[in-house]
């Protein structure tokens, strides 16, 4: 049974199969009856709730409030911002009818042809259009601004090639939509959110990020500028973990959203939008986990510590239960999520493998001999090491160990990124190095033509122009034309 629990395809054999095995065997998610859509199982959803709760708190600390807007968007709304819809047109799911009926010749349920909608409805791929149509009703004066709204919702983008958490036809996310009186204020908002995302991913997910701006080719449809946080996964591929868009006045003009400024003149509103999704779950899984299962950062683990009793008989189990209860209460006083698994239908070895697979940061083993000696065994998931300590010190020790694990897995990820970031000046060398994965820092002449040629020939894209990168000018590795600074190239999810 233990072997069955831990049977994951090794990453060295296939990182793709390893990932899928892990998501399913760790009870995070599974494929549904609807192609491209997933069922997020309770354990996976508990992790998402931790992500959601912390981000929601960070948004509210900066003055944002939550609201909810319709799932359905009239098709005519999307026509108002042409470049915006162009970016999503091939992925849109469309509602054309509003009723079903029984087939008169007995072939089951069919669409009622007489129930065709006067205007087709798009199931939201993103909410800019429906929200800006609403903002037109809300915004009249500078006194109505700024509007700082976030919504937690699901969206649909009809992806053809799907993968659990990373790319699905329906996914969960948050999307922020703000309105401002000035360009400067909107840009400040865009960068503020970028910092929130970066801080969250680094401090809670324990994943180092690079903050940057997208090239025009990679920019969000309808945005003036798209800022992003880029991460590097263990398999050498990049993953975009979040985006924050400065929309300029594009949507305000498309939906005629104007306000009366302090001088009594009418002008268009300035806007931002920003979002992260359940794709963060994919990043969390891929970044830290190993062939034994999940490795979760303690700050996002639904269960941070599991206690497993090892008893010879029922009498000794009762003694262990009593001691474990005291330990649990001490942990709860420190707001540590702890589970005591004294179920008798599975052996300790099975439990060890199960909780290792699920990435519980710390496992405590408490046996009859431990009670006699006043000790307890402590196992940490990130290093798979164990030690025996005094049971009287376990609360403080484990609390400090959780912090150490959080820092250790971040440092491990940071070391990996550093070891897999290279500087390249020659295109032939670039084509060789891109096969090895990782971030490649190379000069780019700033043209879409060069960017597209490199993408076509190598499948590598410009992940971002780093905001805090080296701005030393140079020569484009492909064209020999002048370059303002190095950018990050990588193959990506």
From Swiss-Prot:
Consists of three domains: the N-terminal catalytic domain, the anticodon-binding domain and the C-terminal extension. Belongs to the class-II aminoacyl-tRNA synthetase family. ProS type 3 subfamily. It catalyses: tRNA(Pro) + L-proline + ATP = L-prolyl-tRNA(Pro) + AMP + diphosphate. The keyword Transport does not apply. GO terms for cellular component: aminoacyl-tRNA synthetase multienzyme complex; cytoplasm. Keywords: Aminoacyl-tRNA synthetase, ATP-binding, Cytoplasm, Ligase, Nucleotide-binding, Protein biosynthesis. Catalyzes the attachment of proline to tRNA(Pro) in a two-step reaction: proline is first activated by ATP to form Pro-AMP and then transferred to the acceptor end of tRNA(Pro). This is Proline--tRNA ligase. Homodimer. Its main location: cytoplasm. InterPro entries: aa-tRNA-synt_IIb, aa-tRNA-synth_II, aa-tRNA-synth_II/BPL/LPL, Anticodon-bd, Anticodon-bd_dom_sf, Pro-tRNA-ligase_IIa_arc-type, Pro-tRNA_ligase_II_C, Pro-tRNA_synth_II. One of its GO terms (biological process) is prolyl-tRNA aminoacylation. It comes from Azobacteroides pseudotrichonymphae genomovar. CFP2. CDD domains: ProRS_core_arch_euk (cd00778). It is found in: Cytoplasm.
């Amino acid at each position: 049974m233990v072997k069955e629990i831990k049977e994951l395809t090794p990453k060295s054999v296939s990182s793709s199969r390893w990932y899928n095995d892990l998501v399913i065997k760790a009870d995070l998610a599974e494929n549904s009856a609807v192609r491209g859509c997933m069922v997020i199982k309770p354990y996976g959803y508990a992790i998402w709730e931790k992500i959601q709760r912390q981000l929601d708190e960070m948004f509210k600390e900066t003055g944002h409030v939550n609201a909810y807007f319709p799932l359905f968007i009239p098709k005519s709304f999307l026509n108002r911002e042409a470049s915006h819809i162009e970016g999503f047109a091939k992925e849109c799911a469309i509602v054309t009818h509003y009723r079903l009926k029984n087939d008169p010749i007995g072939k089951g349920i069919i669409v009622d042809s007489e129930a065709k909608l006067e205007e087709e409805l798009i199931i939201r791929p993103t909410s800019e259009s429906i929200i800006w149509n609403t903002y037109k009703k809300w915004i009249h004066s500078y006194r109505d601004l700024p509007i700082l709204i976030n919504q937690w919702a699901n969206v649909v983008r009809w992806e053809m090639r799907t993968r659990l958490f990373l790319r699905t036809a329906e996914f969960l996310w948050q999307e922020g939509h703000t309105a401002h009186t000035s360009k400067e204020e909107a840009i400040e908002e865009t960068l503020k959110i970028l910092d929130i995302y970066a801080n969250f991913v680094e401090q809670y997910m324990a994943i180092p990020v690079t903050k940057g701006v997208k090239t025009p080719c990679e920019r969000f449809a309808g945005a003036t500028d798209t800022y992003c946080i880029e991460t590097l996964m263990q398999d050498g591929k990049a993953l975009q973990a979040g985006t924050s868009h400065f929309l300029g006045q594009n949507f305000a003009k498309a939906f005629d959203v104007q306000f009366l400024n302090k001088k009594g003149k009418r002008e268009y509103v300035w806007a931002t939008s920003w979002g992260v999704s359940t794709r963060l779950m994919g990043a969390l899984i891929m970044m830290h986990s190993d062939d034994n299962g999940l490795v979760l950062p303690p700050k996002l683990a639904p269960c941070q510590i599991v206690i497993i009793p090892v008893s010879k008989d029922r009498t000794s189990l009762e003694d262990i239960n009593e001691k474990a209860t005291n330990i649990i209460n001490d942990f709860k006083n420190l707001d540590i999520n702890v589970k005591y698994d004294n179920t008798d239908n599975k052996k300790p070895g099975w439990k060890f493998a199960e909780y290792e697979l699920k990435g519980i940061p710390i496992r405590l083993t408490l046996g009859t001999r431990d009670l006699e000696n006043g000790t307890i065994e402590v196992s940490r998931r990130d290093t798979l090491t164990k030690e025996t300590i005094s049971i009287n010190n376990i609360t403080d020790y484990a609390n400090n160990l959780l912090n150490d694990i959080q820092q250790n897995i971040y440092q491990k990820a940071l070391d990996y990124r550093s070891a897999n970031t290279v500087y390249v000046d020659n295109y032939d060398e670039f084509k060789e190095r891109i096969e090895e994965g990782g971030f490649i820092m190379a000069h780019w002449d700033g043209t879409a033509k060069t960017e597209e040629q490199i993408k076509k020939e190598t499948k590598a894209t410009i992940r971002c122009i780093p905001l805090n990168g080296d701005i030393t000018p140079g020569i484009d590795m492909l064209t020999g034309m002048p370059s303002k600074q190095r950018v990050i190239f990588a193959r990506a999810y």
